[in-house]
């Protein structure tokens, strides 16, 4: 009976160690890959595409409660 207990203990200890992924198995965080994800208002219409009215002789954009207002700089 003790041999069965030892075998069961060994199996229970080794199984979780092999079932868990190790750190080197994890994919590395790649900032370049995240930058390739194009999150633009053309793809996602819920994003507010803020217009620019700044330029020579023009006013700078202002936002009030997420509404676009052209105001003075």
From Swiss-Prot:
Mind telling me which GO cellular component terms the entry cites? extracellular region
Question: Which domain of life, per UniProt?
Answer: Eukaryota
Q: Which cysteines are joined by disulfide bonds?
A: 53-72, 54-70, 60-73
Q: Which UniProt keywords apply?
A: Cleavage on pair of basic residues, Disulfide bond, Neurotoxin, Pyrrolidone carboxylic acid, Secreted, Signal, Toxin
Q: List, in alphabetical order, the Gene Ontology terms for molecular function in this entry.
A: ion channel inhibitor activity; toxin activity
Q: Which residues carry this modification: Pyrrolidone carboxylic acid?
A: 51
Where does the UniProt annotation place the signal sequence?
A: 1-19
Q: Name one Pfam family in it.
A: Conotoxin
Q: Could you tell me where this protein is found in the cell?
A: Secreted
Is Repeat among this UniProt entry's keywords? Answer: no
Main location, first listed in the record: secreted
Q: In which tissues is it expressed?
A: Expressed by the venom duct.
Look up keyword Signal and say if it applies: yes
Q: Which residues form the propeptide?
A: 20-48
Q: What does this protein do?
A: Shows a paralytic effect in fish.
Question: What remark about domains does the record contain?
Answer: The cysteine framework is III (CC-C-C-CC). Classified in the M-1 branch, since 1 residue stands between the fourth and the fifth cysteine residues.
The record makes one more remark, namely: Found in injectable (milked) (IV) venom. Surprisingly, the propeptide sequence 20-48 has been identified in the venom. It is unknown whether it is a by-product of incomplete enzymatic degradation of the precursor, or if it has a biological function on its own.
Q: Which family does it belong to?
A: Belongs to the conotoxin M superfamily.
State the name under which the record lists this protein.
Conotoxin CnIIIG
Source organism (scientific name): Conus consors (Singed cone)
């Amino acid at each position: 009976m003790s041999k069965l207990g030892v075998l069961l203990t060994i199996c229970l200890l080794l199984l979780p160690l092999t079932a868990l992924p190790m750190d080197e198995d994890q994919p590395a965080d790649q900032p370049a890959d995240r930058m390739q994800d194009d999150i633009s208002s053309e793809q996602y219409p819920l994003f507010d595409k803020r217009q620019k009215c700044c330029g020579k002789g023009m006013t700078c954009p202002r936002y009030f409660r997420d509404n676009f207002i052209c105001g003075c700089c």
